[in-house]
UniProtKB/Swiss-Prot annotation:
GO terms for molecular function: porin activity. Belongs to the Gram-negative porin family. Residues 1-23 form the signal peptide. Forms pores that allow passive diffusion of small molecules across the host cell outer membrane. It comes from Enterobacteria phage PA-2 (Bacteriophage PA-2). PANTHER family: OUTER MEMBRANE PORIN F-RELATED (PTHR34501:SF2), PROTEIN YDDL-RELATED (PTHR34501). InterPro entries: Gram-neg_bact_OMP, Gram_neg_porin_domain, Porin_dom_sf, Porin_gammaproteobac, Porin_Gram-ve, Porin_Gram-ve_CS. The gene is LC. This is Outer membrane porin protein LC.
Length: 365
């Protein structure tokens, strides 16, 4: 409670530090356009768990470019990088990272093709509930874990409005090349060849969507499961299917997703579940004066975890709010109420059961 009081006080202080900003268009001439965008998220976590307590400030910088080749053909590219702001200068940039780096071509109503580091098609559904002020999106959409979040080697085809014939009907197909990260510290971030699909339909604020993806697993991942089947999945393929619903109109945002994964979901940073059933739901309301309260529930249950049986991997209620001073400046508080109980499973594998409060001040353009 003491840390929560401190966190709320920090939000009040951050409100007094608000300032205005403007977006940056670098170039727009002769059918060529280049936009620069970025964000500074000055934030702090408060938690009884030392690993989740402290400064987590970062900055992101990126650009989006577009060139009109002819009436039906457009080239585009995007790059985004994150710089950590909570490290000593002597520690260098080892934790900085590339989020996005891809380029492609758009063929009018016939869709677009791009290649590079991008979002997996499974995130087309996962993104609907990954909208909390700070937390969220952590039951099954994970960075560098097959096709559920950002990762490398994606070739993606996207088609919006179904060839220009049906407004709101979008679909995508994706291929991911092999990324064999064989060192054990990063083995969960590897993948074999894979493919995935997604489809969404949105009409007057309502949306429905589904996705499916399947990939080969690397030899390191499969062999780890043979050695320790209690904590490492041993299947040769990783699969995910997910479905989602959302409503986004009249200042109201409601969304829910359900998914199941096989030999894919990472828990406690190092281990992989044989199977996981995942549920996320979020509700938000945007007041005209800038306040956006948020409440959510997220749960991931691991199935058939060897001697551990079925166990909750993630389970929490999230209560938070964002206040927008204008389109460039905002502040937030987000309270993750962890519902996991301390037991033999969480203690043995290092699964956190502590609450976290995050507060921050964000400038973006």
């Amino acid at each position: 409670m003491k840390k929560l009081t401190v966190a709320i006080s920090a939000v009040a202080a951050s409100v007094l530090m608000a300032m205005s900003a403007q977006a940056a268009e670098i170039y727009n001439k002769d059918s060529n356009k280049l936009d620069l965008y970025g964000k500074v998220n000055a934030k702090h976590y408060f938690s009884s768990n030392d690993a989740d307590d402290g400064d987590t400030t970062y900055a992101r910088l990126g650009f989006k470019g577009e060139t009109q080749i002819n009436d039906q053909l457009t080239g585009f590219g995007q790059w985004e990088y994150e710089f950590k702001g909570n490290r000593a200068e002597s520690q260098g940039s080892s934790k900085d990272k590339t989020h996005l780096a891809f380029a492609g071509l758009k063929f009018g109503d016939y869709g677009s093709i791009d290649y590079g580091r991008n979002y997996g098609v499974a995130y087309d559904i996962g993104a609907w509930t990954d909208v909390l002020p700070e937390f969220g999106g952590d039951t099954w959409t994970q960075t560098d874990v097959f096709m559920t979040g950002r990762t490398t080697g994606f070739a993606t085809y996207r088609n919006n409005d179904f060839f220009g014939l049906v407004d709101g009907l979008n679909f995508a197909a994706q291929y991911q090349g092999k990324n064999d990260r064989s060192d054990f510290d990063n083995y969960t971030e590897g993948n074999g060849d894979g493919f995935g699909f997604s489809a969404t339909y949105e009409y007057e604020g309502f949306g429905i969507g589904a996705t499916y993806a399947k990939s080969d697993r690397t030899d390191t991942q499969v062999n780890a499961g043979k050695v320790l089947p209690e904590v490492f999945a041993s299947g040769k393929n990783a699969e995910v299917w997910a479905a989602g619903l959302k409503y986004d109109a009249n200042n109201i945002y409601l969304a829910t997703t359900y998914s199941e994964t096989q030999n894919m979901t990472v828990f406690a940073d190092h281990f992989v579940a044989n199977k996981a059933q995942n549920f996320e739901a979020v509700a938000q309301y945007q007041f005209d004066f800038g306040l956006r309260p948020s409440v959510a529930y997220l749960q991931s249950k691991g199935k058939d975890l060897g001697v551990w049986g079925d166990q909750d991997l993630v389970k929490y209620v999230d209560v938070g709010a964002t206040y927008y001073f204008n389109k460039n400046m905002s502040t937030f508080v987000d309270y993750k109420i962890n519902l996991l109980d301390k037991n033999d499973f969480t203690k043995a594998l290092g699964v956190s059961t502590d609450d976290i409060v995050a507060v921050g001040l964000v400038y973006q353009f």
